[in-house]
C-alpha cells in the first residue's frame, strides 16, 4: 500500500496509476496487491493496519503519526514490524528549538526498532555525532540521473554562476 499523507489525489495521478493500483478510502480494509490510499485529511480518519504492514517514513510527520499511534495502543493490539526511515535531512533543525523541533527529534528516538537509510555519509555522521541510535543504518549517495545530467551539461553554456554566501 502507498499511503499519501501530504496532498490530495489529483485526476492526473489517478489516470496514470489506475491500471496498476486500486485507489481506496483509508477505512476500506479490502486487500489488493497494490493500493493507493489518500490520507491527507487524516485528522478524523482511521487506517486499518495489520501485522503484515511495514511503514516507510519519508518525513518526520509521517513517522510521528504512526509511531504515536503504536505508543497509544500500548502494545494491546499489534506490535509494529521494524520501521524504515528514509532520512534526507536533519529535520529538527528546521524548527529552532520549538515544539515541532521536539516532535521531529522524537521520531528518531522511538523505542521501536527502526532502520535508518541516510542519503549521504555526512548526514549519517551528524546523526552519529548527536547520539541517535537505530537498529540498523545504511547510507547511499544520490546521483543525478543520466537524462538530467545530460541536460545540465547543455545548460552550463547559458547559465552564469556566481558563488554566494547567505548569512542569517
Describe each region flagged by the PLM.
Residues 1-51:
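N-terminal pre-catalytic "stem/leader" segment of glycosyltransferase-like enzymes
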Residues 44-51, 77, 98-117:
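Membrane-proximal helix-turn-helix segments that form the acceptor-binding/catalytic region
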Residues 89-91, 122, 139-150:
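Short beta-strand->alpha-helix junction loop in the catalytic core
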Residues 117, 157-168:
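Conserved donor-binding/catalytic core segment of Leloir-type glycosyltransferases
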Amino acid at each position: 500500500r502507498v499511503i499519501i499523507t501530504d496532498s490530495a489525489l489529483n485526476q492526473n495521478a489517478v489516470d496514470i496509476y489506475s491500471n496498476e493500483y486500486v485507489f481506496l478510502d483509508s477505512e476500506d480494509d479490502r486487500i489488493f496487491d497494490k493500493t493507493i490510499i489518500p490520507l491527507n485529511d487524516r485528522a478524523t480518519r482511521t487506517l486499518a493496519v495489520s501485522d503484515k504492514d511495514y511503514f516507510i517514513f519519508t518525513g518526520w510527520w509521517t513517522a510521528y503519526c504512526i509511531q504515536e499511534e503504536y505508543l497509544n495502543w500500548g502494545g494491546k493490539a499489534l506490535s509494529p514490524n521494524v520501521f524504515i526511515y528514509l532520512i534526507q535531512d536533519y529535520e529538527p533543525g528546521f524548527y529552532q528549538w520549538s515544539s515541532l523541533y521536539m516532535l521531529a527529534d522524537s521520531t528518531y528516538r522511538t523505542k521501536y526498532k527502526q532502520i535508518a537509510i541516510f542519503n549521504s555519509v555526512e548526514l549519517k555522521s551528524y546523526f552519529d555525532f548527536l547520539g541517535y541510535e537505530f537498529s540498523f543504518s545504511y547510507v547511499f549517495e544520490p546521483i543525478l540521473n543520466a537524462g538530467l545530467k545530460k541536460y545540465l551539461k547543455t545548460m552550463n553554456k547559458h547559465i552564469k554562476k556566481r558563488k554566494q554566501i547567505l548569512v542569517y
